[in-house]
Amino acid sequence: MNVLIAEDEHDIALLYKMALERRNHQVTTTENGENCLKAYHEKCQNRRFAIHDIGQTLPFDVVILDHKMPKINGMQVAEEILAMNPRQRIIFASAYVKETLTDSIRKLKQVVELMQKPFNVNTLIDTVEDKEIYSELKQLDVDLDIIKAINPTHEQIIDLLKRLRTVQKGRTF
């Protein structure tokens, strides 16, 4: 997977980067919201991604944003990215209390994920890698909005996918 990270704390950004790269993900890190947007725009231009082109793949599989950053905060970055690509997957990794961020996230009018710091780096990896699982669930005609509304754990999502695969194998046409 191709991951873009905006995190102003260098040690945390490095931890995320190293952990994800160990899992063979390609990682771009930026230290503030302004540089995150620059990296996102550059990737769009380099790959000639069309803004609002639903048929195109996205420049990054996931964008991980800290909320409070210098220059431009994570919420502003998310707004701009989602205006360009409404299907872009965004994960907020923030020390802010979930309840505080939830109201702001609702204003985005898009589904974004939220991880409250501190968390184990393996939790981040599980969250990032759920994207592949969600893609397979979508291929099985599962309503992802309902699944995300339930807010299942990584293990529950994997269990659901295994069960659906079993059901799918049992179907005969």
List each model region and its residues.
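Receiver (REC) domain active-site loop signature in two-component systems and cognate sites
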Residues: M69
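Charged docking surfaces used in two-component/phosphorelay signaling
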Residues: L14-R22
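Active-site residues of response regulator receiver
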Residues: D66
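CheY-like receiver
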Residues: D126, I133-F173
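C-terminal output helix
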Residues: N35, F119-V128, E132, E136
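Acidic, metal-coordinating helix/loop segments flanking the phosphotransfer/catalytic sites
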Residues: T29-V62
